[in-house]
Amino acid sequence: MATTGALGNYYVDSFLLGADAADELGAGRYAPGTLGQPPRQAAALAEHPDFSPCSFQSKAAVFGASWNPVHAAGANAVPAAVYHHHHHPYVHPQAPVAAAAPDGRYMRSWLEPTPGALSFAGLPSSRPYGIKPEPLSARRGDCPTLDTHTLSLTDYACGSPPVDREKQPSEGAFSENNAENESGGDKPPIDPNNPAANWLHARSTRKKRCPYTKHQTLELEKEFLFNMYLTRDRRYEVARLLNLTERQVKIWFQNRRMKMKKINKDRAKDE
């Protein structure tokens, strides 16, 4: 209880008077021996003589000589930042940065930032790390002069990243090439022996209609007026004279008879 009360009084003095005044008072009022080993722990070690004392070797200094040692009063006194009492959750701003260990090594305070921390743009930093901050404020008129290969925050300030600006001219050229290929290029011929191609591109089996010439139509009309029905021999002769097939002559006569029948029916209705 005596040790706890001494530490509490020291912390109150350091808070009211400051770190330097508290160190001077602590050096004269509180001896370093008050923070030594408790008597209960010493008695426990004396009761177990079988266990050998600890023989760990002291480690090498973690940091080099660039760390400046604190003055004697601050080294002997206990820092207020290390002993954090639950009644005072905040730390005095003038707390010492480093404390001296018994073996001469200097331990780093937990209040300082680690060396691996990065400094962001717009935030104050205690030491430079060689990182160039990106400019956050950019006008829309400055965006076309920027290099499109460097990706920064100013590219997004203009409304579109550089990748989209590169795609726009390439898409226009691609559409022009497609238009030229569709207009100038012919489709590849379809293999008639391929059943898949025939099924996908189904075509009608009906032959293309070939109109008769005027001479052929005139001769067929004369033959129809002479006889509406042709015999097989006469059909063969007419097909040979007009350079047609017998089937073509036969179909023409059938169509001509249907046409004449329709005309006669229309005449009967008019009368």
From Swiss-Prot:
It comes from the Eukaryota. Transmembrane segments: none annotated. GO terms for biological process: anterior/posterior pattern specification; definitive hemopoiesis; DNA-templated transcription; embryonic forelimb morphogenesis; embryonic skeletal system development; endothelial cell activation; male gonad development; mammary gland development. GO terms for molecular function: DNA-binding transcription activator activity, RNA polymerase II-specific; enzyme binding; RNA polymerase II cis-regulatory region sequence-specific DNA binding. Residues 205-264 bind DNA. Expressed in high level in the embryonic and adult spinal cord with a preference in the posterior region. Disulfide bonds: none annotated. InterPro entries: Abd-B_homeobox_TF, HD, HD_metazoa, Homeobox_CS, Homeodomain-like_sf, Hox9_activation_N, HXA9/HXB9/HXC9. Methylated on Arg-140 by PRMT5; methylation is critical for E-selectin induction. Sequence-specific transcription factor which is part of a developmental regulatory system that provides cells with specific positional identities on the anterior-posterior axis. Required for induction of SELE/E-selectin and VCAM1 on the endothelial cell surface at sites of inflammation. Positively regulates EIF4E-mediated mRNA nuclear export and also increases the translation efficiency of ODC mRNA in the cytoplasm by competing with factors which repress EIF4E activity such as PRH. This is Homeobox protein Hox-A9.
